[in-house]
Amino acid sequence: MKKNSRLKFSTVESWSKNVFNLNTKRAYVEEDGAIEWVTGSFGSRISMLYPMGILAGARAKMEYTGVSFAGAEQNLDTGAKVVHIGPNTYSMMMAKSLSKDGGISTTRTLAKICKTAVGAKSYTDCKSLILDDKSISNAIPEVKVECDDAEVSHEASVGKISDEAIYYLKTRGISEDEARAMIVRGFTGDISKELPIEYAMEMNNLIKLEMQNG
């Protein structure tokens, strides 16, 4: 991507459950350029998907917002990678994953700050939500810092829907299934609002179908 260019790359993928989804997305960003990745990953037997930004120019930026949903017999390994080369570069990665019916969901991120990336800032937030007792969710943020003058932070958390939250919503006249769906919609809301409206509607429909399966 050339100087001062901007690109927002939005995808919502829904593959057949027998597909092996191994694809590569990469952006080389020059001075004052910006790449934004927004992804929803559904379906497939196995997915390995990590959009990458190489921030080569001064003040280049990358933002990533993504969600994946692993159901029965699925192993979805998703996230993003960024390499800071230029000075005063910026990255933000927010990755979320859900798993149910024995699915395996892994959120994996990498932020590398090279020696030349003086003044770089990088923030990572990985959150995973497990929807039953037989599924697996992993959050794996990785940071490599070679520059002393950089600001880097990362968070990772794995949780379940609490019985207290379900009970509270049920006392308000909401069924247990709808209560779970509401909590999931809240969990994925950050991603939905970054998508074009038709993509957001499609993603919400896919989440609804995944919640109904099993």
Where are these regions (language model features)?
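Small/polar glycine-rich anion-binding or flexible loop at a beta-alpha turn
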Residues: 162-165, 181-189
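Conserved beta-strand/loop scaffold segments within soluble protein domains that form the structured core
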Residues: 1-167, 171-174, 192, 197-214
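Small-residue helix-packing motif on alpha-helices
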Residues: 60, 179-180
